[in-house]
Each structure stands twice: as structure tokens, then as C-alpha cells.
A protein has these predicted regions:
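Active-site helical microenvironments for divalent-metal-assisted chemistry
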Residues: 1-99
Length: 99
């Protein structure tokens, strides 16, 4: 996993966003993005791996995510978001305009 200040911030957001969530097997959900991030070799890949489920699972963290990520990273996160409907919310659109 690539480590930097931004990766640490992404990790903190991911931990907060997935706090108390479990996967289908009953394991803490945070293990999934951490496992993906372990395979990454760049800062950008690592940040996207850590945050890839945050937009759909924890929309309360939109602001933190958008303030942290680059335009390219946000594009990747949007592509990975399964629930595209949440991306239409006025709050999310407002954050996109700030970029």
C-alpha cells in the first residue's frame, strides 16, 4: 500500500464511513477496502481503493471525500459507485462545481 498524508486522510474517512458495518460473512466491512488498498502501488489508486464504497454507503462523507480527492480520483469513484442515483443529489452536484 502506498502511504502519504492524503492516504492517511482517506483511511480515516473510510474507517468513519464504514464504522459498525459488516460484510455478508459478518466481518468488519473496512477489511474490504483495506485489502484492495494493500495491492495498490500509487497514491491515487490507494485513495480510490479506500474510498470506493463511501459515496454510496455513507453519503454524509461527500464533503470530506470531495475536498480530499483530485478530479481524476473523483471520476474513478463515480465510475465505481453502483447507486448512480445518489450522485444526482444537489449537495453532491454543488461539491462537483467547487472542483
Amino acid at each position: 500500500m502506498y502511504y502519504s498524508k492524503r492516504v492517511k486522510e482517506a483511511m480515516q474517512i473510510a474507517y468513519k464511513a464504514h464504522d459498525g458495518q459488516t460484510d455478508k460473512g459478518g466481518y468488519p466491512y473496512i477489511a474490504h477496502p483495506l485489502h484492495l488498498a494493500e495491492r495498490c502501488t500509487s497514491e491515487e489508486e490507494t485513495i480510490v481503493a479506500l474510498l470506493h464504497d463511501v459515496l454510496e454507503d455513507a453519503p454524509a462523507y461527500y464533503k470530506e471525500v470531495v475536498e480530499l480527492v483530485s478530479k481524476e480520483e473523483l471520476d474513478a469513484l463515480v465510475l465505481l459507485t453502483k447507486k448512480k442515483k445518489i450522485l444526482i443529489r444537489p449537495t453532491f452536484q454543488k461539491y462537483l462545481k467547487m472542483l
